[in-house]
Design a protein with these regions (language model features):
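N-terminal secretory targeting modules
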Residues: 1-90, 102, 107, 136, ...
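Short linear Ser/Thr-Pro motifs
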Residues: 15-18, 95, 184
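Catalytic nucleophile-elbow at a beta strand-turn-alpha helix junction centered on a G-D-S/GDSL motif
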Residues: 86-102, 118-121
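Hydrophobic residues at beta-strand termini and immediately following loops
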Residues: 92, 115, 222-224
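Alpha-helical cap/lid subdomain in secreted, periplasmic
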Residues: 105-111, 126-269
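A short beta-strand-loop structural module common to alpha/beta enzyme folds
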Residues: 111-124
Length: 269
């Protein structure tokens, strides 16, 4: 028994050690020369990180070099801080937030700042919350997250974990004097990238929990479903390009709802 246990322990240790080497040295990895470990500047100069090397290599890059994608907005944050411009609301989220500024650039004026990153889950947003939200010292933060957690983009998670990640972001904001707006997870009947997932009941369950959490903690809850969703929980026809990501018409429907939530949260600020 002891011999077997020792062998098993060695095997386990080997399996833990091996990926650390394998994940940073893979043939064909376009990011092989990117910095790793504790360095003065983790963001490679002179190029933009993207998924041109293929989805598998992009996932490898995220897992081993920039899980929270801190490099994405690092330069933008520095420019914003140097400008001295007041930040009213930071919008943090996934591709639905990331694409919002492209569909409605006029919305992100007057101190509204987009910090969405396509594909992100709540643990990834937590990693960058200090840099992309707290450090900008906004009056409020709009948190819209959970779609990719339900789709399994970074593995499995319980509904409690996803709610907890959003709650942690909200409570960090509150501790720094930042007002909190928690958004509903937008409607979706299916995910193209995760065809086995049936998201409607999970979205509904998480939104109930988020609405209750916001109410109990005095945060604003903004629900986009009345303007986006069908009675069955899908996106209304014409409001999403793929049943998930809003079209310009979808964002136009969201705009007054978001502005009302900001007015409720900040008043005249």
């Amino acid at each position: 028994m002891r011999k077997t246990s020792t062998y098993g322990l060695c095997l386990a240790l080997a399996s833990l050690a091996a990926p650390a080497s394998a994940q940073t040295n893979v043939p064909g990895d376009p990011y092989v020369n990117d910095p790793v470990g504790i360095v003065a500047d983790p963001c490679p100069p002179g190029r933009t990180i993207d998924n041109s090397g293929g989805w598998q290599m992009w996932n490898l890059h995220l897992l081993t070099r920039d899980f929270g994608q801190l490099c994405r907005y690092r330069a933008d944050n520095a420019r914003l801080a140097a400008s001295g411009a007041a930040v009213r609301v930071v919008f943090i989220g996934d591709s639905i937030t990331d694409s919002w500024i492209g569909a409605d650039p006029a919305f992100f004026t007057g101190g509204l700042v987009d910090r969405g990153i396509s594909g992100q889950t709540t643990p990834q947003m937590l990693v960058r919350f200090r840099q992309d939200v707290l450090a900008l010292r906004p009056a409020a933060v709009h948190i819209m997250a959970g779609t990719n957690d339900i789709g399994g983009s970074t593995g499995a998670a319980t509904i409690e974990t996803v709610e907890g990640n959003i709650a942690t972001m909200a409570e960090l904001a509150k501790a720094h004097g930042i007002k909190v707006i928690i958004a509903s997870i937008p409607p979706a009947a299916a995910f193209r990238w995760s065809p086995q997932t049936r998201p409607v009941p999970q979205i509904a369950a998480l939104n109930r929990r988020l609405a209750d959490y916001a109410r109990r903690n005095g945060f604003t809850y903004v629900d986009y479903h009345p303007v986006l969703a069908t009675p069955a929980g899908a996106m209304k026809p014409g409001l999403a390009s793929d049943g998930v990501h809003p079209t310009p018409a979808g964002y136009a429907a969201m705009r007054p709802v978001a502005l009302a939530a900001i007015a409720k949260t900040l008043g005249g600020r």
